[in-house]
């Protein structure tokens, strides 16, 4: 199988991310589990551009976000056909959707750091 340049793979991932985000935001995906509050964080496209893993998160909570990911997984065929037309690809990568906890983890870590800093400031003034 032919390897594709890393730059092209990255650009394709960014285009896929933007198109899927727009489909979600505009309500083009009719599955009721897919909320406009879902966020497509990034897309990992395989070197041969055969598969793409789409990382999704939301501030709505773990259960609702996982439901949204399942809705996207159910609509993967529709999304893939839209992508193939918009991106003018001979073969659009197979899509898989993954619940991404990295944003939630980062937010939690940031809050912990803020609490430590504010606690440190209070003890300095005491």
UniProtKB/Swiss-Prot annotation:
Tree of life domain: Bacteria
Coiled-coil zones: none
Pfam families: RBFA
Subcellular location field: Cytoplasm
Gene Ontology BP annotations: maturation of SSU-rRNA
Keywords: Cytoplasm, Ribosome biogenesis
Main localisation: cytoplasm
GO molecular function: ribosomal small subunit binding
InterPro entries: KH_dom-like_a/b, RbfA, RbfA_dom_sf, Ribosome-bd_factorA_CS
One CC-aspect GO term: cytosol
PROSITE patterns given in the database record: RBFA
PANTHER family: RIBOSOME-BINDING FACTOR A, CHLOROPLASTIC-RELATED (PTHR33515:SF1)
Quaternary data: Monomer. Binds 30S ribosomal subunits, but not 50S ribosomal subunits or 70S ribosomes.
NCBIfam families with a match to the protein in the record: rbfA
Protein family: Belongs to the RbfA family.
Task performed by this protein: One of several proteins that assist in the late maturation steps of the functional core of the 30S ribosomal subunit. Associates with free 30S ribosomal subunits (but not with 30S subunits that are part of 70S ribosomes or polysomes). Required for efficient processing of 16S rRNA. May interact with the 5'-terminal helix region of 16S rRNA.
Name of this chain's protein: Ribosome-binding factor A
The organism of origin for this protein: Treponema pallidum (strain Nichols)
């Amino acid at each position: 199988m032919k390897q594709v340049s890393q730059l092209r793979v990255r650009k394709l991932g960014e285009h896929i991310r933007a198109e899927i985000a727009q489909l979600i935001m505009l309500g083009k995906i009719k599955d009721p589990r897919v909320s406009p509050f879902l966020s497509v964080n990034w897309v990992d496209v395989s070197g041969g551009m055969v598969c793409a893993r789409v990382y999704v998160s939301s501030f709505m909570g773990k259960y609702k976000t996982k439901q949204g990911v399942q809705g996207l997984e159910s609509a993967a065929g529709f999304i893939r056909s839209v992508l193939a037309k918009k991106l003018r690809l001979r073969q659009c990568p197979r899509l898989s959707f993954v619940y991404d906890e990295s944003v939630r983890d980062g937010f939690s870590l940031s809050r912990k750091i803020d609490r430590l800093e504010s606690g440190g400031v209070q003890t300095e003034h005491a």
